[in-house]
Amino acid sequence: MKAHEETNMLESMVVLIDTREQPTERAKKRYEALEAPYERRTLSYGDYSYNAQLPNGKWLFEDGETVSGYAVVERKMHLDELASCLTHSRDRFEREFQRAKDHGARIFLLVENATWENLLAGRYRSQFNEKAFFASLCAWLVRYDLQLVFCKEETSGKIIKELLYRDLKERITRGEFDEGR
């Protein structure tokens, strides 16, 4: 891919937001913080992914198509929600991560308002024992090759966009989309 084609592809990037993400006031602030075009689409897994226009004019994912992204961000509001996903909703959560892994997607698990220190100290609302929570999360990081990101909710939009942009840039650099010329 030529340099100008790479630039055009990166500039065409649109952040995809899963239709199941509720458009709350907090979410709207996150969308604004993306500082990038975005659209709501049905994602096979994850809460955020991306689309981009190939040099031949086609998009990675066509309108109406359920998106199985190359990279996804699974966002959780806090440790409480993550604890619930690893206990009460574990089967559903596991199926979603397995689908992403089977598809070869890069998975970022982003947890707002969280730190390792808060997890290890049990500073969250759940009966999930902190040692079990820690062990379970570490096992998931290894099992699904997850990249874990803790951040404040104010910065999550910016981080989501940058992670997706960098994944797209890396794939372009490696030539993964060269056949779409």
Q: What residues fall within each predicted segment?
A:
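Non-catalytic C-terminal interaction segments of nucleic acid-processing enzymes
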Residues: M1-S68, D80-R181
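Conserved catalytic cores of phosphodiester-cleaving nucleases, focusing on short active-site segments
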Residues: A71-M77
